[in-house]
Amino acid sequence: KNLPAFLDLDLPGEKRVIGGGPALTALKVAYPEVCFTGPKTGEELASSLAEADVFVFPSLTDTFGVVLLEAMASGVPVAAFPVTGPKYIVQEGLNGCLDNNLRSAALRALEVSRESCRAFAGDYSWASCTRQFVNNLAPARRLAH
């Protein structure tokens, strides 16, 4: 997941990593100044995300990134590299920032409105996605006949 790209950044404030995995012990040793919270789900995850000023997403390979929408739903702007997953979700200045310089993206994301992040994520709620799906059924049916 390219965590060192985030962990090595010179940024103001505290760095927190939510989650676990086989590399967790080694990361704790290599980055003792970082707060590793371990895995979180549900309300605990949403609450932890909402405490952040920016959600830094260092992955270069994720194809969608549901976690980006989870952060936005908690009102947290995203900073990420301009690669496949984030490019389809992050809109510059609206819900986060993309840059090949992840530090620059993170610092710019501090200026993004938390409310605009929440509003954007609302377009991906179950109700909204169901509505979009149903609205596309009628045109697809007409094309099939």
Predicted segment positions?
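A conserved mid-protein helix/loop that constitutes part of the nucleotide-sugar donor-binding site
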Residues: 1-11, 22-26
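A charged, aromatic-enriched C-terminal amphipathic alpha-helix characteristic of glycosyltransferases
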Residues: 110-145
